[in-house]
Amino acid sequence: MEVAYYNLAGGINQSLTKTELGIDTKKVNWADSENIEIYQNRGIVKQKGNTLFLDIGEEITGLAEISAYDVNKMVITTISGKIYIYDENHSKKILVDKTLKGIKPVFLNFLNGILMMTEADGLFYIKNNSKYEVVECDLKDLSDNTVTGASMAVYKGRVWVAKDATIYYSALGSYNDFKTEKDAGYINEFHTDTGSVTALKPYKDYLAVYKKDSVYLLTGTSPDDFAIVLFANKGAVGAGSIVNVENKQYFLSNGIFALEQVGELNQIQLGSEISSKIKQEFSSFGKLEGTLCIHYEKRSQMWYFFPYADDNYLHTVWINDYINKAWYKRVIPQDIVTACIYNGLVYTADNKGKIYKEDFGTTFNGEAVKFMWKSPFLALSNPHHRKMIDEFYFLLDTEQDNDFNFSVYKDYDSEYSDDIEKIYSIHQDHLIWADDMMSDDLPCHWTPDNASVPVWSVNKDTMEKAEISEANYAVQLCVSGEDVTQSCAIIGLQFREVYNDD
């Protein structure tokens, strides 16, 4: 008997038992992984690392992107209250003439500049000009106190700010006029709901207004026709974990859910939970209000920086691949405190003031990208019989280097590994382009063992045999690596000559 698996793109699945997890032969779910991602929608590959982008010199509290006329710059705030604008095109770091009192900044792009607020600083606007002038917005609450620590959004040409149970909105096209009658104003304790607003986020033709246990939809273009309706009894923990992706708006509650527009009438409905496969992990998280989600559109991914109860930093990132509907895990060695999208890429910042460009290079700024992947326990057709596996092969993609450790867990025992060996397949039977240093005029040559030049393979796929000893009811495959030079790109698993041992 022969059993083969050519779709390894199931991602981590914590919702099934050990015996259930390996039943699906069409798509392989993962028992666990670290720094492994889906490769070409079918295989698995080691994730890329990160590299140092900028060193500010003190702990960073916030990152954001400011854009004007297709030119993007990075906004950086620090623990001492400094605000920097980094212009990458001119390699310039400009200090803004404003010192923050708070350490929890929120950002909102409006017109060509950016609005900011912290838990101790009122709303202000930074103009995107040569001097990055600061304009105080002077937003006061109903008791004439400065509004701080609020949620913000832009909707229908206005700035919307929510604090406690009140939503304030600016005059049309203005970021600092919250007083003009019949243009600016506020909405207070709508639907007799006195609960605090946790987040504001535009979605389609609506402004989604989230509270802890409910979400409302606001419509209209002027104070005369603004209207709010209760949509669902499912709320959001905070604004940092809400993202718009394609036709949906994802938000974090006791799981991750979505508002989605469906049907010919474009009706809004509440989608099903997308975090059910990793729901077990939620018991390890701390306060979910601190969760940060960023949409990495280039890779069709959402990166969730969940705060773990036993970790003061954001070392572990849960990545949702929404094309493959799969989850995988990224573990970053640096002490990450925040992240943002800048120029379409993911950037993170640590507690030492260093900013990193993520999903780049083969190391974490010089440190090895430690990786691990565990298959489910594979019963290979019949879970009630012990089976001898005479031949097992990894199908490897030789456009990538493969150098990893292999081990096997047997018969649903996840503690003890067996059959430990090393799989090594690097630049085998590759051709390299000729250059001016070659002694002849041939266009290409076989690569020497020590070559580090670009290569292409004669055969894209290669088979590497590995040993699985003894007769077993089920086997779990483990692939791992801890050295800088180790990596993997696996596109299939083949079990040949499988016999029932009865």
Annotate each predicted stretch with a short phrase.
Residues 118, 163, 211, 393-396, ...:
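Short beta-strand/turn micro-motifs composed of small residues
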Residues 1-90, 100-109, 233-248, 253-255, ...:
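Beta-sheet repeat architectures centered on beta-propellers
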Residues 50-60, 93, 97-102, 133-291, ...:
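Beta-propeller and closely related beta-pinwheel folds
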Residues 63, 123-124, 134-135, 152, ...:
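Generic beta-strand hydrophobic packing signal
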Residues 113-115, 120-125, 146-159, 293-295, ...:
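A short, charged
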Residues 105-139:
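Hydrophobic or amphipathic alpha-helical targeting/insertion segments
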Residues 80, 88, 119-120, 164, ...:
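Short strand-coil-strand connectors
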